[in-house]
Regions:
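Short, polar loop motifs at secondary-structure junctions
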Residues: 1, 11-12, 57-60, 169
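Conserved beta-strand termini and adjacent loop/short-helix elements that scaffold enzyme active sites
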Residues: 8-11, 76, 165-168
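Residue-level detector of flexible, active-site-proximal loop/helix-junction positions
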Residues: 12-15, 80-82, 113
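A glycosyltransferase accessory/donor-loop signature
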Residues: 16, 96-235
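Short glycine-/acidic-enriched loop or helix-start segments at secondary-structure transitions
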Residues: 18, 60-63, 118-119
C-alpha cells in the first residue's frame, strides 16, 4: 500500500493555459490546473504536511527534518539549475525590480500554528484578486502561478518587506529547465540530464544528479522515461 489517505478534489474552473517546452525547438500549450493548490490546508487530514508538486522527483529523504521542526510554513527561497548556476532573473524575482521569488514546488506547513492559516488565507486572497496584484507587483504573463501568490503572501505577511516569517527550506531547489532533457535513468536515485546552454541553444552539457531532489520542468521528458522509472521503482 502506497497511501494511507487519498483525497480527491475537483480542479479549479479558471482557464489557465500554459506554454510548455520540450527542448528549445518544440513548444505546446496545455491546461495548467493549479488554482486549488492553496486548499491543501483543508484537504490534508494531518497536522503536519509536506506538499510536493507531481514533477518534483524525490531521490533522498533530506526534507524529513521539517517534521521535527517548529516552523509554521517553509518553502524554497532559492533555486539553481542542474549545473548549480543561479536561475535567470525572471525566476529570481517577480519582475526586474520586484520582490524575491518564493517557490511553491515544496510547501511544508503545520496547522497547529496560527500563522499557517493566515498564510493560506492570504494566498487565497491573492489568487482571488490576481489581476490586481499583477498590476501592483508588475509581474509578467497571463498564466496564474502559485509561485507568485506565495511570494506576494510572504511579502505581505512580512509587513511589505523582507523577512523570515515564511521559513526557508535551507538549500536551493534544483530546477530543470524545460529546455533540458533526461538522457538516461541509471537507477531510482541516479539520473543523467542534458543541460541546454541558455545563450547557445545548439549546445548541451551532461549533468549527473545522484541522490538529490529535482524539479523536472520538462514534463515530456518524464513521459519518455516512464517505463524505465517505474521499472527502477519496482526493482
Amino acid at each position: 500500500q502506497a497511501f494511507d489517505d487519498v483525497v480527491i478534489a475537483a480542479a479549479d474552473a479558471r482557464a489557465n493555459k500554459r506554454t510548455h517546452w520540450d527542448s528549445p525547438y518544440h513548444s505546446f500549450a496545455s491546461d495548467f490546473k493549479n488554482g486549488n493548490k492553496h486548499k491543501v490546508f483543508s484537504y490534508t487530514p494531518y497536522d503536519q504536511t509536506l506538499l510536493l508538486d507531481i514533477d518534483y522527483v524525490m531521490m533522498n529523504d533530506s526534507l524529513k527534518w521539517v517534521f521535527e521542526s517548529d516552523m509554521p510554513v517553509a518553502m524554497y527561497h532559492q533555486a539553481e539549475d542542474l549545473i548549480r548556476q543561479p536561475m535567470p532573473l525572471p525566476q529570481q524575482h517577480l519582475s526586474t525590480h520586484g520582490i524575491p521569488m518564493v517557490w511553491s514546488t515544496a510547501v511544508y506547513f503545520d496547522k497547529r500554528h496560527e500563522l499557517t492559516k493566515l498564510f493560506f488565507d492570504v494566498w487565497e486572497h491573492v489568487g482571488d484578486h490576481y489581476d490586481f496584484y499583477k498590476f501592483l507587483y508588475g509581474f509578467p504573463g497571463t498564466m496564474y502561478r502559485t509561485d507568485y501568490c506565495v511570494s506576494i503572501a510572504n511579502h505581505i505577511l512580512n509587513g511589505m518587506g523582507h523577512g523570515e516569517l515564511i521559513n526557508d527550506l535551507g538549500v536551493p531547489m534544483i530546477n530543470m529547465s524545460q529546455h533540458d532533457d533526461i538522457a538516461k535513468i541509471n537507477s531510482v536515485d541516479e539520473w543523467v540530464f542534458t543541460v541546454n546552454d541558455r545563450k547557445e541553444n545548439w549546445e548541451d552539457t551532461l549533468a549527473l544528479i545522484k541522490r538529490e531532489n529535482v524539479h523536472v520542468m520538462n514534463k515530456r521528458s518524464l513521459d519518455r522515461h516512464y517505463d524505465t522509472i517505474m521499472g527502477a521503482l519496482d526493482g
